[in-house]
């Protein structure tokens, strides 16, 4: 288990539990009661710690390397998944994963950002930072869903769109804007879930949805705390202050009306009980799709556009 900086007291207790278990392996000493007491302390400390996380600490949790990623959710929730590749214009971008499959009995199109789980996969998926061809692939899948009247589920987990020169040369800003436009034009249900880090336009490109769900300890912001601090304070050392000012937590964004539902995580974060988290998000997605099922295409499109116009009006007000 990878422990975060603020989890040191929890790590110390779990280390003691592991030591006791190691000492008694193969021996006759019974210390079950002591282990049970320590485990109860760990559980209590986890609850108290995660009940009062600061925005900066939530940023750490959202970026936890053992947190379930896009492909983990697809593998557990989507059956008969058939991935589709390429944007039919330039290249394949593995930062965006997408395809057709079945979600709890209904055919869907799934699109998500995959960060990778080890060095090799992170490089292969470019750490979840999509290039223009990735967003154009997403547009192709969105249009396919619209053509065949299939609901769309998107899974958001990115630090942002890839900022390299090559991406700018191929029209990164246009690709993001066109993805947002494509989302707004859809006449099928579109449900988006922010499962980790939702970074700026790179996230909203596939999150302009009828229902935006967000995990309890995920973050969603126009800029990273480090980037914001570098601009405002000329130093990334003020990232904690920036995280507070950005109001990037699920709780703040629900209050602001930017997201529709906060999906609760297991005690200690999604990385501690991955299977439980995946099932919980699956239930939330199912609820959202059921809620949208009876709306016709014109109503879906009108309500979706109005929803995001209202968010803009609130910001101007």
Curated annotation (Swiss-Prot):
GO cellular component, one term: acetyl-CoA carboxylase complex
Single GO term (MF): acetyl-CoA carboxylase activity
Transmembrane segments: none
EC code: 2.1.3.15
One Pfam family hit: ACCA
Keywords: ATP-binding, Cytoplasm, Fatty acid biosynthesis, Fatty acid metabolism, Lipid biosynthesis, Lipid metabolism, Nucleotide-binding, Transferase
Top-level taxon of origin: Bacteria
GO BP terms, alphabetized: fatty acid biosynthetic process; malonyl-CoA biosynthetic process
Residue ranges of coiled coil: none
Pathway(s) served: Lipid metabolism; malonyl-CoA biosynthesis; malonyl-CoA from acetyl-CoA: step 1/1
Signal peptide boundaries: none
Top-level enzyme category: transferase
Positions of the CoA carboxyltransferase C-terminal domain: 37-291
Statement: the UniProt record of this protein carries the keyword Zinc: no
Annotated compartments: Cytoplasm
UniProt catalytic activity: N(6)-carboxybiotinyl-L-lysyl-[protein] + acetyl-CoA = N(6)-biotinyl-L-lysyl-[protein] + malonyl-CoA
Major site of localization recorded for this protein: cytoplasm
Xref: NCBIfam families: accA (TIGR00513), AccA_sub (NF041504), PRK05724.1 (NF004344)
Family: Belongs to the AccA family.
Subunit structure: Acetyl-CoA carboxylase is a heterohexamer composed of biotin carboxyl carrier protein (AccB), biotin carboxylase (AccC) and two subunits each of ACCase subunit alpha (AccA) and ACCase subunit beta (AccD).
Reported function: Component of the acetyl coenzyme A carboxylase (ACC) complex. First, biotin carboxylase catalyzes the carboxylation of biotin on its carrier protein (BCCP) and then the CO(2) group is transferred by the carboxyltransferase to acetyl-CoA to form malonyl-CoA.
Protein name stated in the entry: Acetyl-coenzyme A carboxylase carboxyl transferase subunit alpha
């Amino acid at each position: 288990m990878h422990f975060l900086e603020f989890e040191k007291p929890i790590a110390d207790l779990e280390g003691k539990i592991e030591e006791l278990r190691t000492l008694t392996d193969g021996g006759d000493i019974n210390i079950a009661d002591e282990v049970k007491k320590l485990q109860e302390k760990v559980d209590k400390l986890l609850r108290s710690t995660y009940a009062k996380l600061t925005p900066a600490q939530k940023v750490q949790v959202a970026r936890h390397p053992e947190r379930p990623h896009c492909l983990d959710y697809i593998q557990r929730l989507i059956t008969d998944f058939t991935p589709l590749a390429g944007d039919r214009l330039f290249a394949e971008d593995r930062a965006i994963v997408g395809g057709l499959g079945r979600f709890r009995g209904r055919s869907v199109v799934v699109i998500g950002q995959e960060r990778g789980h080890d060095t090799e996969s992170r490089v292969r998926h470019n750490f979840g930072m999509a290039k223009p061809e990735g967003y154009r692939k997403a547009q192709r899948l969105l249009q396919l869903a619209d053509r065949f009247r299939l609901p769309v589920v998107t899974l958001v987990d990115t630090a942002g769109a890839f900022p390299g020169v090559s991406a700018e040369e191929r029209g990164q800003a246009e690709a993001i804007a066109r993805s947002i436009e494509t989302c707004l034009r859809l006449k099928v249900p579109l449900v988006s879930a922010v499962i980790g880090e939702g970074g700026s336009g790179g996230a909203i490109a596939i999150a302009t949805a009828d229902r935006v769900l967000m995990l309890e300890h995920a973050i969603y912001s126009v800029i990273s705390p480090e980037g914001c601090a570098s601009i405002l304070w000329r130093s990334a050392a003020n990232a904690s202050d920036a995280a507070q000012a950005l109001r990037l937590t699920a709780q703040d964004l629900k209050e602001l009306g930017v997201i529709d539902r906060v999906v609760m995580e297991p005690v200690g974060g999604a990385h501690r009980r991955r299977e439980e988290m995946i099932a919980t998000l699956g239930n939330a997605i199912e609820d959202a799709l059921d809620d949208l099922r009876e709306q016709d295409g014109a109503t879906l499109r009108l309500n979706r556009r109005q929803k995001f116009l209202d968010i803009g009006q609130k910001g101007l007000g």
